[in-house]
Amino acid sequence: LNLLNDLEPVVEKELNRHISIAKEWFPHDYIPWDEARNFAHLGGQDWTPQEQRFSEAARTSLIINLLTEDNLPSYHHEIATIFGREGAWGEWVGRWTAEEGRHGTAIRDYLVVTRAVDPVALEQARMFHMQEGFQAIHPGMLAGLSYVSFQELATRVSHRNTGVATGDPIGESLLQRIALDENLHMIFYRNLLDAALELQPDATMVAILSSVRDFAMPGHGIEGFQR
């Protein structure tokens, strides 16, 4: 609790910096809507395997990235529990959640509109994965702060690489836009972690060591993740 209070001025400063440089964007701008067709329920045609796009590796990465983003309610619960909903911490929790919410919306629209993957299997996977939820490996404020610092960086890299793997300029543009969000989130958490090192160096280093030693992406439990 003391560290949360001690970091509050840093959170406020970093939140103001973040808001000043974050660029507003809209998921619908990145979706090729002219490629969309109705499915059978509305008189069109249901998806067939012949319609799938991209390499197997790119499709798997897109699905895993989306399912990972879909678990946002669990992530929100985790960070709201750790950081609280009051003051600058609470403002950041709300801002972070709102920005992250765009990612799943945009990726799902892209995959469904382009018919790149089976939308029925995708929805079934979403239902299963969200019911499983997410729980932090190491509890506690410092452990959580350390974990998200590394996780946001890894997520940025994952989205960027997946965009390149699609070979589709539209898909790459979308995932690059999402990666920019993740990069700003990483910088926010990294700067807080730097401040924590100044205030509680020993405890923070222990948390960093644990995060690096036991690191796993939020979506590590998804079927096919290891591929």
Located regions from the model:
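Non-heme di-metal
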Residues: 1-227
